[in-house]
C-alpha cells in the first residue's frame, strides 16, 4: 500500500514541511487494505468480490467516523442498505426475501433493544444509525447472518470499550 510505504519512508513526516503525520493514517490504510484483501480472497475473481470490497470500504469509513464522532451518517448507512437490497435482486450475496427479512430483523432487533433500555433507564443506549447499519448488514447477509454479527460486534465492542476506558481512565462515565 503506497501511503503506508511512503509514511515509513518519510519517517512519519510530511515530505514538504516535515510536520509529523499521525500514525492513524497509515494504520487506517493498512487495515483497509487487509480487510479488502480478505474480502476479495473470500470471493475470488468474481463480481461478488468487487461488491464485497466496496462494502468493506464503506464499513471501514463507518467504523472510523463512529469512533471519532459517535455517529453513523445516513449518507453511508442508507445507500449501504439500499445497495444490499438491490444486489439481492441478482442474488449477489443472498436472495431478495432473505435480504428484506434480514434488513427488517436487523433494524427491529436494535430498535427493540433501544426502547427496552430507554424504558428501563430513561437513557438512550445507542443511536438510530446503529439500527440502520444492522439493517444494511442484514440486507447483505440475510437474517441468518444477524446472530453472529450481533455476537461478534458485542464482543468486539465490549473489548474496545474496556480498553478505551482503561486507557483514558474514565471508568463507567465514558460513552462507548
Q: Language-model features: where?
A:
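Membrane-embedded alpha-helical segments of multi-pass transporters/permeases
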Residues: 37, 41, 89, 111, ...
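Hydrophobic, aromatic-rich membrane-embedded alpha-helical segments
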Residues: 2-9, 147-160
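Functional transmembrane core segments of multi-pass inner-membrane proteins
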Residues: 49, 54-57, 61-156
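Membrane-embedded alpha-helical segments in integral membrane proteins
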Residues: 30-42, 83-87
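Membrane-proximal soluble regions of multi-pass membrane proteins
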Residues: 1-24, 174-176
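Interfacial loop-to-transmembrane junctions
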Residues: 127-129, 163-176
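Select subsegments of transmembrane alpha-helices in polytopic membrane proteins
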Residues: 21-30, 74
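Transmembrane helix-loop-helix
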Residues: 40-51
